[in-house]
Amino acid sequence: MKKVVVDASVAAKWVVEEAHSAKAVRLLDCDEIHAPDHWLAEAVNVLWSKVLKGDLDAKDANERMTVLTRSPVIATPIAGLMASAFAIAVEHSVTIYDSLYIALAEERAFPLLTADEKFVRRFQDTPLSKRVTWVGDLG
């Protein structure tokens, strides 16, 4: 894949070792990686959660946050995506946060890569399913 949209669940796997992290890391080799500009807050929230649970110490989480802030993601302002994201959210009963990713993927005609299986299932039998790919299905 040359140009992709990734969500925060994929970006978090760049810095937190979990199932399919290696597949997520390989996406960093794509020519272009896009995300709505709220992606970073969502990905860093994963680190915060790991600190709260005692899975990471704050210093380590801070270093991983720095890796995320330096990642090659092309962030798109969410204001221009909001109308389509809202329509997607209402039609498919997903959060605005999640629908922003698929709105961007639709706008750019790029695949959306996610590590969120529930999100993939939400769009399984809809026309948007062609846009959404679970990172676990990558080769």
Q: Model-derived features: where do they sit?
A:
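Residues that scaffold the ATP/ADP-binding catalytic core of kinase and kinase-like folds
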Residues: 13-15, 46, 122
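Helix N-cap/coil-helix junction residues
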Residues: 55-56, 94, 128
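Acidic, PIN/NYN-like endoribonuclease modules and their adjacent C-terminal/linker elements
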Residues: 1-3, 36, 102, 106-139
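Phosphate- and divalent-cation-binding pockets in alpha/beta enzyme and binding domains
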Residues: 23, 42, 84, 121-122
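Short, conserved alpha-helical segments within structured domains
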Residues: 39-40, 60, 81, 101
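Active-site neighborhoods of divalent-metal-dependent phosphate/nucleic-acid chemistry enzymes
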Residues: 73-117
